[in-house]
Amino acid sequence: NQIMRGLYDAKDDDLVIISDLDEIPDLEKLKNIKIKKYAIFFQKIYKYKINLLSESEYPWQGSRIVRKKYLKSPQWLRNKIFKRIKFWQFHRHLTNPQFIHDGGWHFSYIMSLEKIKLKIESFAHGEWNIEKFSNIDHIKKQIEARRDLYDNNRILKKVEINNTFPRYILDNIEKFGEFIV
């Protein structure tokens, strides 16, 4: 919640985006929508490689945006307001929720096998921090088979990198070679 300290001079109608580091909101979408109070970016989630899409996890309820005057705290926005609620249940939790469809990208586990292992071993999700899932051979095998690491039957689909991806990736594609299938 230290984010609030950085917002000391923000105006009440300023927009504040709260997002995980691996979630990238598509700011172009804001040109076509007027945020009244708060909204959620429905994002596509890619795992292990930039172009391995987890279709079964769409829409990923990723980045959140709120007018400063309605922001109680970043944690409130993360956990209380948009706590992985099924999209048809939002009306029970919010008045006039807004959704930003195709609202960006969540690039999860886009790192080396060793760093994936370290991430799993450092996880707050203790149920996933077991030898089977953090084993380098298992990680490599699952990625090659285009399957989620955690034996949940999620299949990852290879997609072409095209103009629906972030501009930075398109402009710097050569930097991402090892992270493209």
Give the location of each predicted region.
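Active-site-proximal specificity loops/subdomain of glycosyltransferases
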Residues: 1-18, 27, 177-180
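C-terminal accessory extensions appended to soluble enzyme cores
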Residues: 95, 99-181
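Extended interaction regions within the primary functional domain
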Residues: 1-6, 14-16, 43, 140-144, ...
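Conserved catalytic core of nucleotide-sugar-dependent glycosyltransferases
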Residues: 23-129
